[in-house]
UniProtKB/Swiss-Prot annotation:
The gene is murA2. The active site is at residue 116. Its EC number is 2.5.1.7. CDD domains: UdpNAET (cd01555). This is UDP-N-acetylglucosamine 1-carboxyvinyltransferase 2.
Length: 417
């Protein structure tokens, strides 16, 4: 297990660039197998989860090359429809291959996926939606066997606006007979990115970014070249790191329209933020103020994936803040580690009460998941003394060379084994 060693108290200053969106590249990589040809994808992040998805694609018969920021997927020889358990367990996003394999090979055999342990994340919505398209599904002993001899369009109303279920249904319906309508669809920018990628291959999809998505099935897709959007969660993480260190940071390739809830809350803490077409500049010259309330919600609400980072900032804010987590039921585990650093945080179910302290101090802490782990790095940047964050492999799932990016803007951080 790798670790990050951080000597805190260094003000972040300068310019940092955001890499491509993790939550776009993973479903888009799954989507490449719908095209019996070659797909070229630009602005790809080098992440542990991306490596895992590439390994799965290669296992089922794809030829994949990753050079610089570009991934080329040749999916002409996709034959296998079974993904081994050891590959499925590496990340939750492997579930996207289910819808894609059904569309391409009319069948899929997978185990339940892995990923961060941040609470109950059932795939019932995925399976329910696929069944509405005519897919036969058999579950036994942790495995899922799908058969979709003739996938037909249908109207599907999601019980919850699940990102994963929305994307899996989109993938399965792209080559289906007839028209599929997804109601109460998730609205995240990454879903719109997936729509745009599929349409660049010849799919006929409209409505992504709204609560109703319409997919008109087509017979065949063609080769494409596509650039994915910047990662809004990485951009938000850098903004929180600047707020934690009372820094001045320009985050390049950050789209303000994807980050309005965070920008609003950071302004409430007293930070100054200026935005342009592809950047956000944050200036924080004093101790942050508490915010009355943050409630995580599906997009365009405050993102659950930025909840841990903002809590780190609020741990040293002046006053008391209340944060309510409505998406995942076990996402406050990291607060135990913040308390080890001197934070005053009380968690009751889905609600955290954060009483800001004058300072937190360095400690040895453990990253238990991706976003909670990076929140501990942020805390270490603003802490007095040295912090060691164990479990760097969790953070590597969503951040490319995090220590290099932070070091480039003044952080004293190194990776150690």
């Amino acid at each position: 297990m790798g670790k990050f060693k951080i000597n805190g108290g260094k003000r972040l200053y300068g310019e940092v660039e955001v890499h491509g969106a993790k939550n776009s590249i993973l479903p888009i990589l799954a989507a490449t197998i719908l095209n019996e040809g070659v797909s070229v994808i630009h602005n790809c992040p080098r992440l542990k989860d991306v490596d895992s998805m590439i390994e799965i694609l290669e296992h089922i018969g794809c030829k994949v090359s990753f050079s610089g920021r570009d991934i080329v997927v040749d999916a002409r020889d996709v034959k296998d429809s079974e993904i081994p358990d050891n590959l499925m367990r590496t990340m939750r996003s492997s579930i996207f291959l289910m819808g894609a394999l059904i569309a391409r090979n009319k069948k899929a055999f997978i185990s339940f996926p892995g990923g961060c342990d941040i609470g109950h994340r059932p795939i019932d919505l995925h399976l329910k939606g696929l069944k509405k398209l005519g897919v036969e599904i058999e579950e036994s002993y942790g495995y899922i066997r799908c058969k979709g001899v003739r996938v037909r369009g249908n109207e599907i109303h999601l019980d919850l606006p699940s990102v994963g279920a929305t994307e899996n249904i989109m993938l399965a319906a792209t080559l289906a007979d007839g028209i599929t309508v997804i109601r109460n669809a998730a609205k995240e920018p990454e879903i719109e990115d997936l729509q745009n990628f599929l349409n660049s291959m010849g799919a006929r999809i409209t409505g992504a970014g709204t609560n109703t998505i319409v997919i008109e099935g087509v017979k065949k897709l063609h080769d494409t070249e596509y650039t994915i959007i910047p990662d809004r969660i990485v951009a938000g993480t850098y903004l929180c790191a600047a707020a934690m260190t009372r820094g001045e940071l320009t985050v390049v390739k950050a789209l303000k329209e994807h980050l309005e809830p965070l920008i609003s809350k950071l302004k409430e803490t007293g930070c100054e933020l200026k935005t342009g077409n592809d950047y956000i500049k944050i200036t924080c010259n004093k101790r942050p103020k508490a915010v009355d309330m943050i409630v995580t919600l599906p997009y365009p609400g405050f993102p659950t994936d930025l909840q841990p980072q903002i809590v780190s900032v609020l741990s040293i804010a002046e006053g008391t803040s209340i944060v309510t987590e409505t998406i995942f039921d076990n996402r406050f585990k990291y607060t135990e580690e913040l308390v080890r650093m001197g934070a005053d945080i009380k968690v009751e179910g889905r609600v955290a009460v954060i009483r800001g302290v004058d300072k937190i101090t360095g400690a040895k802490v453990l990253a238990k998941d991706l976003r909670g782990g990076v929140a501990l790095v942020i805390a270490g940047l603003g802490a007095e003394g040295t912090t060691v964050v164990e479990g760097a492999e969790h953070i590597d799932r969503g951040y490319e060379s995090l220590e290099k990016a932070l070091k480039s803007v003044g952080a004293d951080i190194v990776r150690i084994m």
